[in-house]
Amino acid sequence: MKKLFIFCLCLLFFLAACNSSETKEKSSETKSGSSSDTKVFKQDDGEKIKIPKDPKRIVVLHPTYIGALVEFGHKPVGVIDFVKQNKTLSDATKGAKMLGQNNVEDIAKTKPDLIITTKEDKNINKLKKIAPTVQMDAMKSDYKAATKELGEIVNEQDKAKKWIKNWEEKLEKDKKSLGNKVDGKTITVLQSTPKGLTAFGKNYGRGTEIVYGGYGMMQPEKLEKETKNAYMATPSEEELSDYTGDYIILATMGETPQFTQTTNWKNLDAVKNNHVIELDLQQTQYNDPISLEKQREIILKQLKEMK
């Protein structure tokens, strides 16, 4: 009888230990997500992180990474409120919650299962406590690579490849139709900011991806050197002739920049030849699929009308 009692007691301790172990494992799975519900994603910086296999509530904290998700049928539940200043993306994200960059509490209230932001985001540690957070790096990942990555995140790799293929075919067709207007020609993308003039590199929206990567136009030599490892250069008004060539894209918020009234501007070859393409930043600032399609439409039309 005594032996039976001891056996039963040991059995109870064993079962209790097993139950405790199972509870801990389930608790751990609930907190971090079951391994069957997650996948490993490699970020631009090389770090591998776990993200949901099928994210349903995505928050995007930089406008550049919104358009591809919308294009693939995965409209974010929350987006950075900068999109209010951009008609193209604002129209595409109607119904999404507008979020301030530093308003972490509001971001948490959207109950995201995935957050997409940039490597520069200062709130990254706080965001990671809310949901798995992907950091994108525009210096390491151009718009095509970013489109592929976003397709991978939402399991739409085929849609990403198809968009890129169709996009490249459109640009090649444009290039042939434009002929001598773009062959061997130089072009500069300019914007006036409160800090002065900005001339952009080859991967910064505002038509750069189209005229450089798509149409094969070139940067003036000085601009090319200065933007080889940077997003932009900042020439003075007096230096404009060194940074501009056959064509100029002038990106504005609808205003007439003061520098366009100066002699320095009026004496530029592109200006004298009426080779200035005007872009409204409220439609054309970013380099996502939706914004790029809009930019192409505007740039192609203006180039065709030029002599």
Task: Report each predicted region and the residues it spans.
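Short helix-initiation/N-cap motifs at beta->coil->alpha
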Residues: 43-46, 94-105, 227-237
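Structured C-terminal subdomain patch of bacterial secreted/periplasmic proteins
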Residues: 243-307
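Alpha-helical, coiled-coil/dimerization segments enriched in small aliphatic residues
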Residues: 83-86, 198-231
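A short, structured surface patch at a secondary-structure boundary
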Residues: 60-109
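Bacterial Sec-exported substrate-binding components of ABC uptake systems
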Residues: 4-8, 18-61, 159-190, 252-256, ...
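Charged, glycine-enriched surface loops/patches
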Residues: 124-161, 182, 260-279
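Proline-aspartate-enriched helix->loop->beta-strand connector
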Residues: 104, 111-116, 132, 240, ...
